[in-house]
Amino acid sequence: MKLLIVDDEELTRTGLISSIDLDSLGITEILQADDGVNGLEMARLYKPEIILCDVRMPRMTGIAMLERLEKFLPDSIPIFMSGYSDKEYLKAAIKLKAINYI
């Protein structure tokens, strides 16, 4: 199973990678992108089953990225993460069937 991590902070991406128990989750490949535009391209190319992404990023938000990906990867599992508690982002994440918002 492929995991795509999309976050504009490299430290966050590397921290997540080092803390995720890949074997227990069945993850065989980790992909990374530094914003929504690059995340969209990586997702289209590699078709990850799980997408873990930040909500607020430069160039394209995680919400906008996953709205566009819904057409191409309707079965992917989105998980949003954010340091913000904005209710509008949370509502948008729920609409996109995010399994979690952390």
Residue positions per predicted region:
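A generic structural motif
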Residues: 24-30, 46
